Amino acid sequence: VYEPYDELSLLVRMHADGFYDKEVVASVAGGYKADCAGPDWARLVQVFQNPSLQLASFTITEKGYALTDLAGETLPAARQDFAAGPDAPRHTMSIAAALLYRRFQAGGHPIAMVSMDNCAQNGKKLREGVFAAAEAWERAGLVPAAFLAWLSDEKKVTFPWSMIDKITPHPSEQVKKALEDLGLQDMTISRTNTGTLIAPFVNAETTEYLVLEDAFPNGRPPLERAGVYFTDRATVEKAEKMKVGTCLNPLHTALAVYGCLLDYSSIAAEMADPDLKALVEHIAAEGLKVVEDPGILSPRKFIDEVLNERFPNPAIPDTPQRIAADTSQKLPVRYGGTLQLSLIHISEPTRP
């Protein structure tokens, strides 16, 4: 989806009235596979050694940060990486640590490592993964202690937290056909060997939020001009908890489970069902009683937008079946915080 299209992609914003707002995304200068045995590795190392590099962002899903299995055992790829050192990394966290080691060797210029995955405390997850590899290498004598000291210096390396929100379903056949009807060619939707659907276009809703901890030791682009919120870590966490625990994800999961049971094929269709709409409105109302306001985003306005604009949008090809995946793992995060705060609220004595 990069080289055959001259590194260009097409963003298709899907409006509720059926209008497709199309924009060419031309911000990718080169696509390089992070494979230490592949032809792109030398170029990727060169990019990471460049003093002008300000940040590296990650969108690898929450599972991409995991170094252990459900039993707590180190994954085979990570175990091999820890023993082999920074010259032959395979796991994403080891690859990130290896590239940082190359930057350290080239002068140790500052950099921000920014996770933009949709999970709680994403910057912490990235930092822990990188440090797990680096510390294993240091214990084995494969990297000097000075590398760990450099990684630990927040004037040199940071791992900002972020909250990201934009419903972006799998590439849609309907969108593909609409683009082909306009004369665009080679809009093929492909499936990778891991099962991910990819295409030269991305279809998404119009709403978007990105809240970033402002911790960039080598400077940063003026992303606030594009609507990005910059703030401190505590506010990022409040915004993330607001979304994940109250204003969006719990409602999504409720619709997903009932949508599967009642054989719905879209979230928008569920929102046209009076009973299901009342269900998520009630869940939202309960959450609003205890949610902590992050200040930069209004929980009430956020939830009103979700219920009245985002979920009912019939143009979004989002299915309850997609959202229902891994529900058992999501329940503690999406409902646990609100339930815990509600119990505390109930147990507090009423003041006269």
Q: How would you describe each model-predicted region?
A:
Residues 1-347, 351:
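Substrate/ligand-engaging "lid" and interaction regions
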